[in-house]
């Protein structure tokens, strides 16, 4: 299933910070495109559900300490946050 992508304002800020830090944004874009297209991520990305304050969210790893937090609602995928563990939690 193909999803319509939406981005929170916080995600846009996080995205700019990742660029400033010199992260390989192509990796993030590839994973986001795969998620938008409804593809299953490879095991290395450790895609999983979150709990607690993030009960309806999912998280995947772009790299070992670079995460992407997102939500899926029917036909929409909302990219909420990206950054390191210490940035997000």
Model-derived features: positions:
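Basic, Lys/Arg-enriched alpha-helical interface segments
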Residues: 1-64, 72-80, 86-89
């Amino acid at each position: 299933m193909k999803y319509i992508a939406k981005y929170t304002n916080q995600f846009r800020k996080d995205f700019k910070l990742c660029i400033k830090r010199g992260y390989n944004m192509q990796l993030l874009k590839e994973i986001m495109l795969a998620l938008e297209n409804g593809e299953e991520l490879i095991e290395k990305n450790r895609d999983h559900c979150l709990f607690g304050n993030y009960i309806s969210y999912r998280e995947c790893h772009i790299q070992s300490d670079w995460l992407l937090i997102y939500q899926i609602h029917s036909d929409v995928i909302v990219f909420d946050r990206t950054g390191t563990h210490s940035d997000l939690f």
